[in-house]
Design a protein with these regions (language model features):
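Multi-pass membrane glycosyltransferase architecture that uses lipid-linked
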Residues: 1-248, 270-423
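Generic multipass alpha-helical transmembrane bundles of integral membrane proteins
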Residues: 250-266
Length: 423
């Protein structure tokens, strides 16, 4: 594809996201970013309860069950703090400017990811496949809503995953993987296949150590320099491992039935225990993937990465919409380079994720919260007559997403001969 056309597509994708950047946002997550950037610059504890930011906050959906706290390593607090510092330096007292600045790392990360997908594919298969990939990512309603509207930053972490998979040196691969974990902890599920491609190779052992030690070292350095207290960090971050609730998965059925009171009083304890099943499941299937696929090849590596992503999505007690980005990014490369027959599966998965996102967020009304303070009342008035029907759609979409994940996993484990290790 000509360079001018690539640039034009990237600029268009950027402009579409920027059009939503300053006046939309999720009333829980994006409001947290607003409070977080303010707290970092005013001596607050980013891992404690974040109070509203004076003159900047726009929502307060928080409760005893959903407190205004974060569960990320220091990368994101630092970045939101930098955006607030930039806002303060500009000196224009306009909260929408702050919202615009907070969205910039997210949007730039998402557009950069589109280019990285194109670059990876085109370097291995010149032709139309790279063009399809960049079109898919830049203009998918799902990616646009998550970055430009919602304000979720997972695309930044996925950029590091793609860079890690692209690295020739195992140590460099470990460095990129470590930065991905530092950006958001989800990429830790990919560290083993990204770095441990040959257990007999000493560089692979070094790479996995680097990938795990780097985010810990960077986090420790930030806490020392910023003098942030560490009393709440471990419990806050660890609490997300088995966190449950409404989920873009078949777990929605369990949560729905429990909400109706049809399960015994011990069900929440069982649900909490089952919420941790994804960890041993991931360990087992990571071992299976490394044994089954030739992870020293590009194709085998991405098959293994897809297995890790799918196991995470299938067994995690709470799957939020942004988690699907990890699967979709890997699947785009898989479909474009090696398995075009899976394009229908990728398309269906994306459509189901979009449906779930729309239904789960009250038909997108809540994203207007920065400009419409009465959005909660409007949501209630519009949704109340159809609440049962919406809940059913919610459960169906979540279950359908898991069914598609299982189908993709079975397809993967069938494997093409070129991606499998010799017996």
């Amino acid at each position: 594809m000509p360079v001018r056309r690539i640039v034009a597509l990237l600029v268009l994708g950027l402009m579409i996201r920027e059009a939503f950047s300053f006046w939309t946002g999720h009333p829980f997550d994006f409001e947290l970013w607003v409070r977080l950037g303010y707290a970092v610059n005013h001596g607050g504890d980013p891992y404690g309860i974040l109070p509203p930011a004076p003159g900047l906050s726009f929502a307060n959906l928080f409760s005893s069950d959903s407190t205004p706290t974060i569960a990320y390593l220091p990368f994101w607090p630092l970045l939101t703090g930098l955006m607030y510092a930039t806002y303060s330096m500009i000196g224009l007292n306009d909260r929408f400017l702050y919202y615009f600045l907070l969205k910039q790392p997210v949007i730039i990360g998402d557009v950069t990811l589109a280019y990285l997908l194109y670059s990876y594919i085109s370097s291995r298969k010149p032709g139309a496949s790279g063009a399809w990939a960049i079109f898919f990512w830049l203009f998918s309603p799902f990616t646009i809503m998550l970055s430009g509207v919602w304000g979720m930053f997972d695309s930044i972490a996925i950029c590091f995953i793609i860079l890690s998979a692209s690295a020739v040196s195992r140590v460099k691969s470990g460095l990129w993987a470590g930065l991905g974990v530092f950006a958001k902890s989800v990429p830790i599920i990919f560290v083993t296949p990204l770095t441990l491609r040959n257990i007999r190779n000493g560089k692979s052992i070094v790479a996995i150590v680097v990938a795990l030690a780097l985010p810990l070292s960077l986090s420790a350095a930030v806490f020392l320099v910023m003098r942030w207290p560490v009393t709440l960090v471990n419990s806050t971050i660890a609490s997300t491992a088995g966190k449950g609730g409404w989920s873009m998965s078949i777990w929605d059925v369990f949560f729905y039935v429990n909400s109706l009171g049809w399960l015994p009083s011990s069900a929440p304890l069982l649900y909490g225990a089952l919420g941790l099943v994804w960890i041993p499941a991931l360990l087992v299937f990571t071992w299976v993937a490394i044994r089954r696929f030739r992870t020293d090849t590009d194709e085998g590596l991405f098959q293994a990465l897809l297995v890790c992503a799918l196991i995470f999505l299938i067994f995690k007690a709470r799957v939020t919409e942004q988690y699907a980005l990890y699967l979709l990014a890997l699947a785009v490369i898989d479909v474009a380079l090696w398995n075009p027959q899976r394009k229908t599966l990728l398309t269906l998965t994306t459509i189901v994720a979009i449906i779930y996102l729309v239904v789960n967020n009250y038909f997108l009304i809540r994203f207007l919260s920065p400009i419409y303070p009465g959005y909660v009342n409007f949501e209630n008035a519009m949704i109340a007559p159809f609440s049962n029907l919406i809940t059913i759609f919610h459960v169906i979409a979540g279950t359908a997403f898991t069914v598609l994940n299982v189908k993709y996993l079975l397809n993967l484990l069938g494997g093409r001969r070129s991606s499998l290790r010799p017996v």
